[in-house]
Regions:
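Short, Lys/Arg-enriched N-terminal segments with co-localized hydrophobic residues
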Residues: 1-7
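Short glycine-/aliphatic-rich beta-strand segments at the starts of folded cytosolic domains
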Residues: 11-23
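Short amphipathic alpha-helix segments
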Residues: 26-40
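A common structural junction motif
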Residues: 39-42, 74-83
């Protein structure tokens, strides 16, 4: 897991990515805990929101695992905080991968 700056050494190419953004950093940790317990996903990173108390979580795995993890994360987060956005990219394009690292640690 990467929180803040630095570059991940792990290669996530070919893995689906699930991204969710919440209004509370604490709720993000509760949600990512539920996600990682619900399915075989790796938490790629947690990025703090610049203007608020929230954060964005990126997790990687197979499409089915990322979907199950996302469902679990959102179910736990919904009563705790505002869910700004969430999405799953089943097969990120080669050029998309570097862009997902650009904001890490910013």
């Amino acid at each position: 897991i990467m929180i803040g700056g630095g570059i991940m050494a792990e290669n996530y190419n070919g893995m689906a990515v699930g991204i969710f953004e919440l209004d509370s950093l604490a709720a993000c940790f509760v949600a990512l805990d539920a996600a990682s317990k619900a399915a075989n996903v790796k938490i790629q990173n947690v990025e703090r929101n610049r203007l608020g108390a929230g954060a964005c979580v990126k997790m990687r795995g197979s499409v089915s695992d990322v979907t199950a993890a996302m469902d679990a994360a959102l179910k736990v987060a919904e009563p705790l905080t505002k869910i700004f956005s969430h999405t799953i990219i089943a097969s990120p394009a080669h050029d998309t991968e570097p862009a997902m690292y650009m904001t890490a640690g910013k």
